[in-house]
Amino acid sequence: FAIQFYEILVGFGVAGTGFGVILAVVGRASSQENRAMSLAIATASGSAGQIVGPIVAVFLLESMKWQSVFMIFAVSILLVLLLLPFMRAPERASKDEIEESLSEILSIALKDPSYMMIFVGFFSCGYQLAFITAHFPALITEMSAPIDPAGWCGDLGIETTAALGGFAISVIGAANIVGTLAAGWAGKRYGKKWLLSGIYAGRSIAAAWFILTPITANSVLIFSFSMGFLWLATVPLTSGLVAHIYGVRYMATLYGIVFFSHQMGSFVGVY
């Protein structure tokens, strides 16, 4: 029970420091014209942390126990609090936002087909991401064609299909940073709903192509980069769309509800 209790606390900690809270703060502190790019930078930074974090953890584990490494990461996260005084959100919301209470905004949003489409779309996003993260490496390990030592895999030191599966996840993470920043740049110039539609369509096309193609190192690399480029590109566009439609005053609550659908999709995808 004690272990499960700590796991629950970790879940609350992740929720309290996740995209729902961070993007709301960034969204409120950003101007309308720069909001999409600001949200993209915040999202991409999280992806960069997922790349750098494991490398640092492995380095530290060579010289200390995992408990000490855990405490080092915890303290480093607490140090982020020192940056809070530099965050400058608008002192007051617009007149329209002040006149509408949270209950009124929620009532409007829950009856709005656009909000429901965002909700459903983010559910599918969570399903796709969690499904690939949980099952893609195992699929490559079991189903991929043998590695050619004379090919690019051999040049990178990838000798087994299991290593190729781990490399594929790394490619997804690296491409995700580029794709997220590109989505933020595009969201400033083009309609967010059309960009989101294109991203979801692109994922479907990439998945269909991979399923219908023999699984080789080359197809794994192409699919990993394509899916990685579209991985979290939905986040700055979705959060920016919520802020654009309903304002930033209750963005944390409204985006939190949408992100809840993302997590439900993630659960279904892993299960």
Residue ranges of model-derived segments:
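Flexible cytoplasmic inter-helical loops of multi-pass small-molecule transporters
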Residues: 88-104
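Glycine-rich segments within core transmembrane alpha-helices of 12-TM secondary carriers
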Residues: 36-54, 256-269
